[in-house]
Amino acid sequence: MTWFIDRRLNGKNKSTVNRQRFLRRYKAQIKQSISEAINKRSVTDVDSGESVSIPTDDISEPMFHQGRGGLRHRVHPGNDHFIQNDRIERPQGGGGGSGSGQGQASQDGEGQDEFVFQISKDEYLDLLFEDLALPNLKKNQHRQLNEYKTHRAGFTSNGVPANISVVRSLQNSLARRTAMTAGKRRELHALETELETISHSEPAQLLEEERLRREIAELRAKIERVPFIDTFDLRYKNYEKRPEPSSQAVMFCLMDVSGSMDQATKDMAKRFYILLYLFLSRTYKNVEVVYIRHHTQAKEVDEHEFFYSQETGGTIVSSALKLMDEVVKERYDPGQWNIYAAQASDGDNWADDSPLCHEILAKKLLPVVRYYSYIEITRRAHQTLWREYEHLQATFDNFAMQHIRDQEDIYPVFRELFQKQSANQSA
C-alpha cells in the first residue's frame, strides 16, 4: 500500500495561496470597498470581517475573441431548425450591466452581478491599516545593549540534559524502531503462522518444525537487539536570544466631552479613537495608551470610561493639555519614550482659553512629543481654537490638524494623519 503524506504548509486550507494571490492582484478594488464599508459599521463592530464586492469588469481577464461586424463563414451541424445554406441572423448587440443597480432597463443583453466574497478579520485589518505608521518613531539606542529576550526555537539534536524533550525523543525512538523492525516483524508473523499450520498437520514434519523454530528465534533476537533509545533519537529544546525592539511609545487620547459635543459628534470622535486603538494594537507590540476626557475639568480614565461615560459639562480645553503635561513629567521621560497625542474636539472653547492652549502646546508639549494630531469635528465655521492651532501648524512640523464634517471623512482623515512616509522609517 502506498501512503501519501501532505507536508504542505496549508494542507487544511489548500486554496490559501490562491486567495492571497487574489488579494494582492485586486488590492486597490478591495481597499476601496473596505473604505466604503467602514463608514456603514457601528462603533462596536469596526474590527470584524467584511463582505467585499468587486465590479465584474474589474476582475475580467483580457482575452482574444471575434469582434462584432464583418463577414465570416462557419460550418455548423444541422438540426431540426436549420438546413444547409440557411442564413442565420446576427444576434442583437448589447452588454449586460455589472449588477450594481446603476443604469437603465433594457430588453437586450446579459451580464453578471458584482463578485462578492468574504475576507477574514485579519485580512480586513491588514488592508485597513496598510501603509500606516506612527510618524517620527525613533529607537533609543542606549537601550538596545541589553534588550534581548530568550525565545523557543524548535528542537535540536545537541544540547544539555536539562533541556531534553522526553516526548519528542520517545517519538523518534518509536519511529526508528518501527522502521527498523517492520520487515522482520512481518517475516516473524509469517513464520509463526506457517509453524502453527505445520504443527497441526499429519503426518508430523519434525525437521521442518525445528527449522522454523530456529528462524523464529533468530528473528526475535534481531528484533530485541534494536535499542529502545539511541543517541540518534534524542531531541533537545532549543532556545535562542533575539533582540527586542527598544522603542517605547505612548499615545495620549484627548477627547472633548463638553455639552457642545452632541451625540453624533461624540460617536464620530469615538469611531476615530477606535480606529486609532486598533491600528496601534495591530501594528505595534507594546504601545501604552493614556485616555483623557475633558470638559471644564480633565480626568485620566480607563478605556471603558473613555468610551462609555456620560459625564459632560462646559469647555476648557487647556485642562486636558495641562493634565497631559503633568502625566508626561511624572511617567514618561521624553528621552526614553516616543510620545504621541491625538486630540478630538468640536472646536468650541472658551475664547480666553484658546491662547493658553497655544502657549501650553508651543512651550511644553510640542517640544517633547514626536507627533501631535488634532481633529475638529464640526459643520460650523472654525472658531478661535482652530485659528490658534493654525499658527502652531505653520511653526511645528510635528503638529497636524484635520477637519471632519461627516462620518465619511473619518477614515480618509485617519489615513492622512498616519500615512507612512519614507522619512518615518527610522533605523
Swiss-Prot record:
Superkingdom classification of source: Bacteria
Bias kind Basic and acidic residues: ranges: 79-90
Gly residues composition bias: residue spans: 92-102
Cited InterPro entries: UPF0229
Disordered, as annotated region: 79-110
Family: Belongs to the UPF0229 family.
NCBIfam families documented for this protein: PRK05325.1-2, PRK05325.1-3
Full protein name: UPF0229 protein YeaH
Protein source organism: Salmonella paratyphi B (strain ATCC BAA-1250 / SPB7)
